[in-house]
UniProtKB/Swiss-Prot annotation:
Protein name as annotated: Autophagy protein 5
GO biological process: autophagy of mitochondrion; cellular response to nitrogen starvation; piecemeal microautophagy of the nucleus; protein transport
Designated gene of the protein: ATG5
Organism field: Scheffersomyces stipitis (strain ATCC 58785 / CBS 6054 / NBRC 10063 / NRRL Y-11545) (Yeast)
Subunit structure: Conjugated with ATG12.
Keyword check for Metal-binding: no
Length: 282
């Protein structure tokens, strides 16, 4: 694949988005907020606009521990929103149980499920919740984890200057691919990655496979099929798999036998993890 093609694919993945419908149950009515959100981003970044909109209905909303819910399940705001969509909502679309082009989630402001999702622990001087600070802390920790897997240590990210660290965060908030790439290339290995940071999710279960993968086997490069067959043998033991791997909402079964390192380089998320959602065939 030509470098120009890879650049184009990365740009399309970076700019991919979903339609989000946020519903607030208020008294005897349901109020809606409609927006688009980048897949390779975080739902928390939409909270300031969501809070501003719904504050007309709920007093002091910006000071409350807010959380999102989908079909009774609290949404883990620390994960990329595209991954959440594929993990929670995509199976319903593939099974024809839903046909809506937008993802409907509920905004909750009481009974925070802190045993299931990370609480927002920081507050601003005015007493409002500092959502951005919590998200920044989570993303930096994710980048440190992936950096360690890729390099064998976290030195590349820990060695970033203060200016570079600020630029990296701003590029994520602004969703600026060029600015993000210019800093992220200081984190990822210039030559060969020691291991590849991979996380595998299975809808309808709490199973999450966290697998630092060696990019090369004894004789040939490691493929995604190798990884899935090893960790999910009940789904991928046979040549004809009974499940489909989705990355960024794309059915990637055609990439099962491609080198995993190549797939990671193109499809990694902004925290440098490769997230794979495995959906059983219907």
């Amino acid at each position: 694949m030509a470098d120009s093609d890879i650049i184009e694919i990365k740009a399309k993945l970076w700019n991919g988005h979903i339609n989000l419908r946020v519903v607030l149950a208020y008294k005897d009515q349901k109020v809606e907020y409609l927006c688009t959100i980048y897949r390779n981003s975080y739902i928390t970044l939409k909270l300031p606009a969501i809070v501003e909109y719904f504050s007309a209905f709920v007093q002091g909303l910006s000071s409350k521990q807010l959380w999102f819910e989908y079909e009774g399940v609290p949404i883990k705001w620390n994960l990329p929103v595209g991954l959440l969509y594929d993990y929670l909502h995509l199976p319903s679309l593939l099974g024809n149980f839903e046909s809506s082009s937008s993802w409907t989630v509920y905004l909750r402001y009481d009974d925070y499920p802190s045993d299931y999702i990370i609480p927002f622990i920081y507050k601003k001087d005015d007493g409002t919740v500092d959502f951005d600070r919590s998200l920044k802390e989570v993303i930096v920790n994710q980048l440190k984890q992936s950096c360690f897997v890729l390099n064998g240590n976290s030195k590349p990210i820990m060695s970033l200057s203060e200016a570079n660290s600020i630029q990296l965060w701003v590029s994520i908030v602004d969703h600026n691919l060029s600015a993000y790439t210019s800093i992220n290339k200081k984190i990822v290995p210039k030559d060969k990655a020691q291991k590849i940071p991979v996380r595998i999710f299975i809808p309808g279960t709490t199973t999450i496979v966290q697998a630092p993968i060696y990019p090369y086997g004894e004789e040939e490069p490691t493929s995604m099929r190798d990884v899935l067959s090893l960790h999910l043998p009940h789904l991928f033991a046979e040549r004809e798999a009974i499940a489909l791997p989705y990355i960024h909402g794309i059915d990637t079964q055609s990439l099962l036998d491609e080198p995993l390192l190549k797939t990671w380089e193109i499809f990694k998320h902004l925290d440098n993890f490769l997230y794979v959602v495995v959906i059983p065939r219907v």
